[in-house]
Amino acid sequence: MQVQILALSRSLARAGVDQLVLTLGFPGLPPTKQIEPGLTVRIARMSLPQIRSEITGLVGLGQAWLIGTIREWSGCVAATGGPTSSTCTRRSDLATGRGSDRRPD
């Protein structure tokens, strides 16, 4: 699945669609990495205890990603739809639905 998502994300970036991909990440990876222009990958998860589960891998992994994603998104887009931080990769015209989703050539 990750290979398919990477291929789709790269194709969309090359077509001019700016994207911020939120992932669980792994220890030792940089918190943010720009793969190519228009495609940024950011780790979004909360710390969680290392309690193993035979069914899901780690207890609470999905919930840690959900909380991290909500925290990341709320930090990037204010109630007005505009970015609240210079680290956000979303443009305000995309967040509000106004303007083009194409990057200028």
Curated annotation (Swiss-Prot):
Residues 80-105 are annotated as: Disordered. This is Uncharacterized protein in grm 3'region. The lineage of its organism: Bacteria, Bacillati, Actinomycetota, Actinomycetes, Micromonosporales.
